[in-house]
Amino acid sequence: VFKIKISIDALVNSHYNLMCHCAYISNFNIKRNFTEQKEETAFWSVEVKELIYLPIEKLTEGMELARNIPGINPMLPFAVTGCKLSERMIGRMKTIGVQGAYICTSITQGIEPEDFVEPELKAKMLTSIRDVFDQSLKKFTFQSSRQVYEEIAKVAESVVMNVLNKDKYLFQMIDIRDYDGYTYSHSLYVGILGVLLGKYIGLSISNLNDLALCGLLHDIGKTDIPIDITNKPGPLTSDEFEIMKQHPSLSYKKLGDHIVISQAVLQGVQTHHEKFDGTGYPFGLSGKDIPLYARILAIADVYDALSSTRPYRKAWSPRRIFDYLTSCSNTHFDPELLTAFLHCVSAYPIGTIVHLSDGSSAVIKDNTPGFSLRPIIRFISPPQKAGIDVDLSSELFNLTIIDDDEC
């Protein structure tokens, strides 16, 4: 815990979102500071608490939330920053599919996770995506289809600007989401991940906007699939899977019939389940015959899906996801794009707790591009190592992270 001073003017002019960054007003003692011009400036004394991310099974009663837990409505959180967890709350979080939470601690001073998308912007994006999907369930009119396009185009532009404004290519986000909101958050993150990869390989802003639209709309055809199939809490039967396989073409038709959108976007949406070796659907395209946007979306789609807890399975561990993606190079995925993608994402986001091969525990301090599975860590146990920082990408340290499913 440490204290900083922030000018009230700075708070107003810079729109500091203290709650989202785990800052708490500890003393409402206004100090007077007169400049040479005798202008008066007031300061708040602000106490900033550090945080770590813990998976749901590690949460215990009495822990203090360091960030909001979103509810079904993105604008209305299930639990707010600063509240103390109870056993009942933890049980409810498990029921709605929350994977973990940021918790206040004094262990990680100087380690601050950076939101890839600011929470307020993310909530607005998710609300817009939900509105678009809800509208797609109704009969489109000329006016409603134009409104849908304008709304989703604004989200796409926000996604692109958000990615372009990031200095780092590394995507590191722990998404605290519920089952009911999966479709919307999945669409958003496929858009973000696609644009991130597109930026890395040098696509133009116009192409990035198209790519964002592809990601945001790639699953909109699922609104025409029976809900007992899309929301089935278990593996699909072969007949159900054949119905589910129709969603790329349904997305293409729904968008093509009602919304003025580029052919490149439509093709990307329609072919995002094609595989590099020709075994995908709906057309069995292979290699570079698959549109570029679709080859990018294929990677982003699978990565986000495996990173997410679903009603019928837990989220995969980072190492398992990376191993799976690598094993699918040149079969499911374009190998060049996959190599680039793995440079763009971090397996272990800053602030997460990990276990190491020597039995010690650590918190992720930072990540190095190209070494996603070997980040910079800070030991938290055993006591004789606590507080020591180590870069696992260095050959000097023969340590590896042991994922939960390996313990």
Give a label for each model feature:
Residues V48, N73, K166, I261, ...:
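Short flexible coil/turn linkers enriched for glycine and charged/polar residues
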Residues I8, V12, Y16-E36, A42:
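Short, positively charged and aromatic/hydrophobic N-terminal segments
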Residues S106-K245, L250-V260, A264:
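Acidic/His-rich, divalent-metal-binding segments that scaffold phosphate/diphosphate chemistry
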Residues F2-I6:
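Extreme N-terminal basic, low-complexity initiation segments
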Residues K232-K253, K275-R378:
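Divalent-cation-assisted or electrostatically stabilized phosphate/pyrophosphate-binding catalytic cores
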Residues F28-E150, P382-Q384, D391, E395-C407:
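Membrane-cytosol interface segments
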